[in-house]
Regions:
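Catalytic pocket-lining loop regions of alpha/beta-barrel enzymes
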Residues: 1-134, 159-169, 173, 220-223
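Mid-to-C-terminal alpha-helical segments outside catalytic/metal-binding sites
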Residues: 122, 126-133, 141-233
Length: 233
């Protein structure tokens, strides 16, 4: 499989991990282990020319409030399975493992920002700030503007810096957050965003943006409302 991928010129392997209910050992009996990162380290070490991008950063919790996860993190300093992911580079000597934060950031960034900060701190400390990739799962959560705003505003609690050795997240428009928002993924996919800015500034989306600005500006019309899937059953 990996040999065929490399022969085809593919360098990025995106793998869905985590996101299981609390009763996963019973409801996913015989298969839940594949949602953990037990198999990532060997693959990354055996195939250093490939990038392994772990979706949802392998966070286990799903379909429940983050209260228990936050309490567990503040008691132990660990986020189930995401901490295991973050330990892989140091424990196995690899630098081709990435953490994507779709859904798991959305689940906590507004109601439990300390957990969101703990997640980012864990990933940045273990994987490196340049190995954390943005994700919103917006087909499920609707317009991602509220998630973008949340990351721009999020700060690392001083308590976490002292207790866990986490670095700060930097300025709202700083290198760390801009890297997470796009530059990290651009590098992985060999996209030179900076050299393309000239062309992008004159494309169709730029024209639409200009129309909105003329009509009142993004600061006036922009909304953090989320429009996504709604279960009416």
């Amino acid at each position: 499989f990996y040999e065929k991928i490399q022969k085809a010129g593919i360098t990025n392997i995106c793998i869905h991990k985590g996101l299981l209910p609390s009763d996963y050992e019973e409801s996913f009996k015989g298969s839940w282990e594949y949602a953990t990162v037990w198999d990532v380290a060997k693959a990354a070490k055996d195939w250093p020319g490939l990038n392994f991008i772990i979706y949802h950063s392998a966070c286990q919790q799903f379909l429940e409030l983050p209260d228990n996860q936050l309490a567990h993190f503040e008691a132990t300093g660990e986020i189930k399975w995401a901490t295991d992911l973050a330990r892989i580079p140091e424990e196995h000597g690899v630098n081709n493992v990435y953490g994507e934060i779709g859904t798991v950031f959305a689940n906590s960034c507004v109601t439990h920002p300390r957990l969101a900060a703990g997640l980012l701190g864990t990933l940045i400390k273990g994987l490196g700030s340049d190995h954390v990739c943005w994700g919103t799962d917006s087909p499920l959560y609707g317009s991602p503007q509220w998630q973008i705003e949340a990351l721009r505003r999020l700060k690392m609690p001083e308590e976490y810096k002292k207790k866990y050795g986490f670095a700060g997240l930097g300025a709202p428009n700083g290198a760390i957050k801009n890297g997470i928002f796009g530059f990290n993924s651009a590098r992985v996919y060999n996209l030179d965003v900076r050299s393309s800015m000239g062309r992008l500034s004159g494309d169709k989306f730029a024209a639409i943006k200009k129309e909105v600005q003329v009509a009142g500006g993004f600061r006036t019309n922009r909304s953090n409302a989320a429009y996504g899937y709604v279960n009416t059953a």
